[in-house]
Swiss-Prot record:
InterPro entries (UniProt xref): Ribosomal_uS10, Ribosomal_uS10_dom, Ribosomal_uS10_dom_sf
Keyword Iron-sulfur: no
Protein name per Swiss-Prot or TrEMBL: Small ribosomal subunit protein uS10c
Subunit-level organization: Part of the 30S ribosomal subunit.
Species lineage: Eukaryota, Sar, Stramenopiles, Ochrophyta, Bacillariophyta
GO molecular function: structural constituent of ribosome; tRNA binding
Record keyword Plastid present: yes
Recorded family membership: Belongs to the universal ribosomal protein uS10 family.
Superkingdom assignment: Eukaryota
PANTHER family: 30S RIBOSOMAL PROTEIN S10 FAMILY MEMBER (PTHR11700)
Compartments reported by the entry: Plastid, Chloroplast
Function of the molecule: Involved in the binding of tRNA to the ribosomes.
Length: 107
């Protein structure tokens, strides 16, 4: 896949664990710095919070409930560069830890 100069690559990262997400951002930034790409910006997106309400008892006591929440932390890395290095292949081949969902968009 050929990439034109002055193009932008957006990498969207999502995870339930914010520490894992930050280490993944650092790893991608190291990959870009090793290939002489300096135009990297990290944008934190709002955290999604889902709350699930569950009855504790199977039959009665509707007043007794438990609440569980799942937080989804999100970041966007915007990489703009002007070089002959194929950053897209390096990002696809990068070994990110399990538990981090990433999407790579070319624009």
């Amino acid at each position: 896949m050929e990439i034109k100069p002055n193009e932008k690559i957006r990498v969207r990262l999502e995870s339930f664990n914010h520490e894992l997400l930050n280490t993944s951002c650092q790893k991608i930034m190291e990959i870009t710095q090793n290939n002489n790409v300096d135009n990297v910006g990290v944008v934190s997106l709002p955290t999604d919070k889902r709350i699930y309400c569950v009855l504790r008892s199977p039959h009665v006591n509707k007043d007794s409930r438990e609440h569980f929440e799942i937080r989804t932390h999100k970041r966007i890395l915007e990489i703009s560069y002007d070089s002959s290095v194929n950053i897209f292949d390096l990002l696809v081949k990068s070994d990110l830890p399990p538990g981090v969902l990433y999407r790579i968009c070319l624009s």
